[in-house]
Amino acid sequence: MHIGIDIVEVPRIAKALNRGDKGFLNAVYTAGEAAHIEQAHAGDVRAAGIWAAKEAVVKAFGVGFSEGVTFRDVEVRYTATGQPQAVLSGKLASLAVDRSLQVLSISISHTENYAAATALVGPVSAEVRPV
C-alpha cells in the first residue's frame, strides 16, 4: 500500500483561476472537473480540493508530475453521495497497469483557506472494505 497527501492554500488556486482567461483551468482540470468547479457554490475551494487530490494520487504512485504524468492524468469524479473517486488516464494509467496498482480511495477536506487530500494506492487485487 502507498499513501499520498497534499495540502494547498485556497487563495493560491483562486488567484490562478481568476487571472481572466481559462488557461490554468484548462491545463490542470478535465472538462468534467472544470464544469464541476464552475457550478460549485465555492468553486475556488472545490478547485483547490481537486488540485490537492491530484497531487496526493501522483505522490502515492511515487512519480509526482514526472515521467510524462500530467495533472489531467488524474480526474476527480464524485459519486451520487458526494464521495470523490480518482479515474486515471494517460501515462499514469499506463504506470498503474505496469505496476499492477490502483487507486483504492481518496479523501478531500477543506476550510476557507486550505484544502487537503489523501490517496491510498494498492495492488489491483486489494479490496477496500467498510469498517
Curated annotation (Swiss-Prot):
InterPro entries: 4-PPantetheinyl_Trfase_dom, 4-PPantetheinyl_Trfase_dom_sf, ACPS, Ppantetheine-prot_Trfase_dom. It comes from the Bacteria. Disulfide bonds: none annotated. Mg(2+) binds at D6, E55. Pfam families: ACPS. Its cofactor is Mg(2+). It is found in: Cytoplasm. Keywords: Cytoplasm, Fatty acid biosynthesis, Fatty acid metabolism, Lipid biosynthesis, Lipid metabolism, Magnesium, Metal-binding, Transferase. The keyword Magnesium applies. GO terms for biological process: fatty acid biosynthetic process. It is an enzyme of class 2 (transferase). This is Holo-[acyl-carrier-protein] synthase. The gene is acpS.
